[in-house]
Curated annotation (Swiss-Prot):
Family (UniProt): Belongs to the ketol-acid reductoisomerase family.
Cofactor stoichiometry and binding remark: Binds 2 magnesium ions per subunit.
InterPro entries: 6-PGluconate_DH-like_C_sf, KARI, KARI_C, KARI_N, KARI_prok, NAD(P)-bd_dom_sf
Cofactor(s) for this UniProt protein: Mg(2+)
Organism: Bacillus pumilus (strain SAFR-032)
GO cellular component, one term: cytosol
Binding site for Mg(2+) 1: 190, 194
Enzymatic reactions: (2R)-2,3-dihydroxy-3-methylbutanoate + NADP(+) = (2S)-2-acetolactate + NADPH + H(+); (2R,3R)-2,3-dihydroxy-3-methylpentanoate + NADP(+) = (S)-2-ethyl-2-hydroxy-3-oxobutanoate + NADPH + H(+)
Residue ranges crossing the lipid bilayer per the database entry: none
Name of the protein in question: Ketol-acid reductoisomerase (NADP(+))
Annotated NADP(+) binding sites: 25-28, 48, 52, 82-85, 133
Oxidoreductase as UniProt keyword: yes
Amino acid sequence: MVKVYYNGDIQENVLNGQKVAIIGYGSQGHAHALNLKESGVDVIVGVRKGGSYTKAQEDGHQVFTVKEAAAQADVLMVLLPDEQQKKVYDEEIKDQLEAGNSLVFAHGFNVHFHQIVPPSDVDVYLVAPKGPGHLVRRTYEQGAGVPALFAIYQDVSGQAKDKALAYAKAIGGARAGVLETTFKEETETDLFGEQAVLCGGLTSLVKAGFETLTEAGYQPELAYFECLHELKLIVDLMYEEGLEGMRYSISDTAQWGDFVSGPRVVDANVKESMKAVLTDIQNGTFAKEWIVENQVNRPRFNAINANENEHQIEVVGRKLREMMPFVKQGKKKEAVSVGAEN
């Protein structure tokens, strides 16, 4: 059974006298920096000159270049996109680390897949809120918090666990509960969830349903409503009450269809495909492909993205969403995973 830590389980003074540098000031960086500051932690921000730099200054932080921040800090939290971390680490962070520092991440990708190899004389740990930055910030302001994960990769000081928990507490995570994991488990389950269910699996299911209806002669507008628009209603119920609560809230007809038709769509073959996806994550195949794709400036990524954006479901959806002013738009880049823009 997973171990969960709350505020009362965590030492108060572990971060006292420690200067924490937040590297990156996107969705997560913004939330971490403000929450830490309001928890009494000595915080600075390291970011490249530009919009994020100015925004961090406007929020009242001491702002430096990444290299300058890294040179001052005792604790460095790297909150940059996965694909940017290695370059920034190699060029601006690595040579600034001193023995006894803490190198912290919110996702284990680069450490687990050996893109970043920390020196042997620093603590390395992970603190990962299970929610987007704006939610981490909003719940903190409300006196609550978002559950978080923590993991220890390297404990030189003998206090890495205490430091990780203290950090999680300072951003509000221990108000909701902090769960212990490993870099391997966090990285592999996070990637699998994104690929097989939350992003890849879901978008493919939605498109397949839409195409099935339109190819059978149904109007694309109705197909959009049935296969995409109404998804939020169901997901919200699942989010709040689980599968049981969702099924309680829908009609008996819908529930019966769930029971008898769902397993026909997501059958044993789909599960075998999921296992293959997991294997590619575990053995590093996916990571290698993504790293190489970025090294050659993303030709496949960009081509697929452009093609997907012109799928009929997108063309129809843009028009229908204009009819619904209650649907919030314009937040395409709000970070919903742990990585944040710098």
